[in-house]
Amino acid sequence: MNHTALILILFIAIVAVLAMLTAWRPELTRERGGKVLAFVSLCILPVLAMWAGATEHLQRSTSTQFCLSCHVMADFGKSLFVDDRSYIPARHFQNNFVPRDHACFTCHTDYTMFGDYRAKWRGVHHVLVQYFGTIPKPEDIKLYAAYNNRECLHCHAGARAYQEASSHHKKPDMLALAASNQLSCISSNCHDIVHDVATLKDATFWSPQANAK
């Protein structure tokens, strides 16, 4: 249990005690100190508890474990271990180009002012579909919209390997087109092999444990 969860439990306990005290001794609110106590216990602390809970949930929901907790996501998690460099998620995950504990969120958030919250709002929709909707087959799951190069360039822009890659200079203006989002990084016959869960039955897989020996 981390510090945020402990603080949340402490807040809830304090709110409960103060609320019971206010209900048991309503005459306390007749005095100025009692009114302050009631305001803190019934208004300030609940808001702080809600904020702490929301912060804790937001942090947990960015974890790879959370994203893959739905059964329909199992094949997407499996695709991170495909032993093929052309699989973009696998290459990034296996080489620590993205933090493994937050791999899904790192690539699927929007790198804008409120991008994290938009990503979480989409996550709420996923949860609703998981429990109340019709769950699609893994191979039928698609992005809501075309993947924006902004998300790729958040990490790759300015990197020497990106700037000097021969494949990025097949045309003289490729980097400029990618920067302006006119040429998609993950389509246009470039990095177009992403999760490809429909092909996993024919794939070979990398084992971190085997390579650690």
Residue ranges and their predicted role:
Residues M1-K213:
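Short sequence/structural segments immediately N-terminal
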